[in-house]
């Protein structure tokens, strides 16, 4: 449903940060492992390279770097943070990595938890955090989108291994007056009936416990994806949810300063932009360098564009995330920057 509540305060995005692994793998390098080429990958995805987490790196470590950078931009002390939400489907600890992140940051006053919504995770977490702030229950929140899908990819499957990379991005949210509100509207959707076209399923190994009793010991298979179905889902549902969002907020596409989509495939980015006649100069993309970093793509791109001066305070951004679940969402954001 559209966000229309005015209870409590507004929410301002006052800081951002990002981090990526040191290992960079090019398309040509992947072509040494699987039957593919730079031209084949770029023509179908727009991806030229991706960052892959190394043996001495962790998702929590990347998340810490991104969150610390967001704190620095916002000018906050870690102890002033009330809430930390880590959007990830690939935590270091399946029970949750957000509490470890809280400890490393020194954010002793913050409640911290993971939120899992795959590639939609960052937007879902952003909107969740905003509701805590708007009720007045909390004042400051860190939202981190981070994933290490390289650990769950079949590196011998050229259809999927070329797509994914690792990374982390973070934003700092602060409760503000309604006049400074930076989250102007949102839409969230889920459809589990189509979830089998993109998943990371369990693999079960039979284990005999005691006489007459058995158990299926759990593990996970590599990422399973029907690329054609995911593409059709994205080019159909993303324009539709953005159209609903723009109508609900009485926003004309031409009034947008930027279109910031989940970085999954350049063809999807182009199709959505064309649907709204948004010029390519307004479409933010770093897909070529990083690939699909799942929950990290939107905050990673946001931070890059803020750091290089493309995104300026007061500018209007339409953002949409989509992915496994199936899940998808959209948000209309006005970038604020440090207060």
From Swiss-Prot:
Residues 263-267 are annotated as: ACP-binding. Keywords: Acyltransferase, Cytoplasm, Fatty acid biosynthesis, Fatty acid metabolism, Lipid biosynthesis, Lipid metabolism, Multifunctional enzyme, Transferase. InterPro entries: ACP_syn_III_C (IPR013747), ACP_syn_III_N (IPR013751), FabH (IPR004655), Thiolase-like (IPR016039). The active site is at residues 119, 262, 292. The keyword Oxidoreductase does not apply. Its main location: cytoplasm. The keyword Lipid metabolism applies. Pfam families: ACP_syn_III, ACP_syn_III_C. It comes from the Bacteria. It catalyses: malonyl-[ACP] + acetyl-CoA + H(+) = 3-oxobutanoyl-[ACP] + CO2 + CoA. Coiled coil: none annotated. Pathway: Lipid metabolism; fatty acid biosynthesis. One of its GO terms (cellular component) is cytoplasm. It is found in: Cytoplasm. GO terms for biological process: fatty acid biosynthetic process. Its EC number is 2.3.1.180. Catalyzes the condensation reaction of fatty acid synthesis by the addition to an acyl acceptor of two carbons from malonyl-ACP. Catalyzes the first condensation reaction which initiates fatty acid synthesis and may therefore play a role in governing the total rate of fatty acid production. Possesses both acetoacetyl-ACP synthase and acetyl transacylase activities. Its substrate specificity determines the biosynthesis of branched-chain and/or straight-chain of fatty acids. The last Arg residue of the ACP-binding site is essential for the weak association between ACP/AcpP and FabH. Belongs to the thiolase-like superfamily. FabH family. NCBIfam families: fabH, PRK09352.1. PANTHER family: 3-OXOACYL-[ACYL-CARRIER-PROTEIN] SYNTHASE (PTHR43091), BETA-KETOACYL-[ACYL-CARRIER-PROTEIN] SYNTHASE III, CHLOROPLASTIC (PTHR43091:SF1). This is Beta-ketoacyl-[acyl-carrier-protein] synthase III.
């Amino acid at each position: 449903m559209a966000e229309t509540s005015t209870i409590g305060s507004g929410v301002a995005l006052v800081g951002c940060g990002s981090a990526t692994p040191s290992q960079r793998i090019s398309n040509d390098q992947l072509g040494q492992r699987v039957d593919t080429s730079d031209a084949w990958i770029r023509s179908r995805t727009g991806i030229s390279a991706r960052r892959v987490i190394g043996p001495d790196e962790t998702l929590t470590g990347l998340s810490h770097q991104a969150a610390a950078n967001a704190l620095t931009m916002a000018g906050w002390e870690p102890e002033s943070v009330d809430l930390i939400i880590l959007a990830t489907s690939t935590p270091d600890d399946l029970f949750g990595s957000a509490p470890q992140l809280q400890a490393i940051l020194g954010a002793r006053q913050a409640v911290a938890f993971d939120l899992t919504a795959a590639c939609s995770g960052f937007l879902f977490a952003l909107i969740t955090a905003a509701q805590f702030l708007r009720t007045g229950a909390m004042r400051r929140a860190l939202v981190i989108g981070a994933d290490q899908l390289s650990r769950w990819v079949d590196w011998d499957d050229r259809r999927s291994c070329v797509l994914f990379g690792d990374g982390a991005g973070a934003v700092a949210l602060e409760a503000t007056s309604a006049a400074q509100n930076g989250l102007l509207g949102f839409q969230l959707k889920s459809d589990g009936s189509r979830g089998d076209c993109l998943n990371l399923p369990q693999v079960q190994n039979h284990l005999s416990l005691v006489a007459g009793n058995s158990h299926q010991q759990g593990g996970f298979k590599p990422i399973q994806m029907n690329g054609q179905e995911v593409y059709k889902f994205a080019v159909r549902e993303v324009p539709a949810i953005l159209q609903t969002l723009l109508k609900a907020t009485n926003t004309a596409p031409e009034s947008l300063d930027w279109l910031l989509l989940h970085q999954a495939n350049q063809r999807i980015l182009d199709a959505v932009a064309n649907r709204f006649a948004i010029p390519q100069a307004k479409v933010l993309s770093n897909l070529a360098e990083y690939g699909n970093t799942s929950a990290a793509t939107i905050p990673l791109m946001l931070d890059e564009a803020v750091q290089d001066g493309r995104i300026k305070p007061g500018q209007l951004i339409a953002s949409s995330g989509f992915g496994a679940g199936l899940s998808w969402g959209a948000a209309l954001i006005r970038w604020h920057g440090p207060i």
